[in-house]
Amino acid sequence: MPASFLASLRAWIASSTIGQRILLALALGLLLITARVISKSKGTMPPGPRGLPLLGNIFQLPKLPWYRFTEWKEEFGPIFSLNFAGTPVVVLNSHEVVGDLLERKSTIYSDRPRFIMAGEILTGGMLIVFTGYGKVWRKLRRAGQEGLNVRASEKYQPLQESEARLLTTNMLREPAEWDAHLQRAAASSIASAVYAWPPLTKSDDGLVHRIDELMRRLVMAGLPGRYLVEIFPIMKHLPTWMAKWKREGLEWHRRDTEMFEGFYDNVARFMASGKYKPSLTAGLIERQEKNGLSKKEVSWLAGTMIGAGAETTAASLSVFMLAMTLYPDVMRKAQAEIDALVGRERMPTFADRPHLPYVCALVKEVLRWRPVGPVGVPRRTSEDDWYKGYFIPKGTLVIANVWAMNRDPAIYPDYDEFRPDRFLDASGNEIDIAGTHGQGHVTYGFGRRICIGMHVANQALFIDIAALLWAFNIEAPTGPDGTPILPSRTDFVDEGLVFRPAAFRCKVTPRIDDVATMLATLEKNA
């Protein structure tokens, strides 16, 4: 996010008038002077790198800023401060600091910076990830948790098992298109959980594509500096005939609301007929009055789960494919565990999950090794705070460096290696890592903003990964001399919503000759 701010700022400067540049400089100067006066009068912020006058540290951040954050951690410690054009920023880099602030002081550290375009105009204040810490956020969060907690997530398991069978069948038919199959499976699985839709037949399904485009639009709108209204909030009150950006944003909100409410109406009709399967939306409708939610709020809460959930799950499955290509010994060990329990007459199911500790550890390692959200969405302090002698003023942006915490050598020795055994003791029992909410990593976030869909996501990753390991070998292609052509360990791309491996080649081959017949039989008997 900060790196995109740099690109946005450069583009705006290049296209702005001299008067606009002078106005921006004056505003930034006033903000910086005010921030310094207030900060120095109350205490000293954590140390950090020296920046430029007015602009601070924004030009010191590369395209993938978590790498630079991790370097600064070594220089300045687990908590350091930055200046983004007058806005104070604090970056948290250790489990201890995150636990002290985002967990134990969550009432101060659970708010969001104001996203006028993304959080107010485009979404009407109903996108939970951008919603400020207040009454609306609490009721959306409570309703979402009721439909996605550990117990509630179990009712989606039959749908997820069906999706895993379809993923395996599609992978068998077109192994070279494995990435497209992963994207289809991720989108279809979350759509089934949210709306009880039948399996999607292609990765670019029209409805899911519309939701994906909405999520990308929101991510772009949330980038600092993307819209001038974020710097001058009074511009939000301009009439639409004077502000094209506002007019277009409101029109997008109208269209997206119409789409989501249409999905809501379809579920409501099936519920009225008595012919419906369990889904997140059905549960939200059943508890709508109790939770004090409007039709529009339920529609947006459900609809936006698809975009966020599909992208992150597909990216994590891509990380799994990369890891298996690079670490064949890990793949073979997981396959041996599956074979010993499941055999070749059936696919793994959720009933096998408690008896597949190494596969479960492998899922954790996928999420730790290359987190698809290395820093997440910034938070904002809602009041002044002091921590270990440092002053953190109200309105400070707070960034949790998930990348650094998942690679803390004190917790994860040889952190750059893909090693599921790190989550198991000598007897094969799960090791609890403090401060991770039983996950073994911090990829799902912290405190009151921890990902509410993590249980559904963990289920989807487990059943898809177990099915793929049961059916296939995933290997590096070989050159003319038979030498494996290994993909890059570090070539990743930031797609706005997720951080995922750059396109790479791998070879997907069936582990047994009659797997197609077995899959057809399993699907027929399901």
UniProtKB/Swiss-Prot annotation:
Keyword flag Cell cycle: no
TM segment ranges: 13-33, 115-135, 306-326
Top-level lineage group: Eukaryota
One Pfam family here: p450
Subcellular compartments: Membrane
Residues forming coiled coils: none
Primary localization: membrane
Family of this protein: Belongs to the cytochrome P450 family.
Role this protein plays: Cytochrome P450 monooxygenase that is able to use delta(6)-protoilludene as a substrate to produce delta(6)-protoilludene-8-ol.
Name the record gives this protein: Cytochrome P450 monooxygenase 253
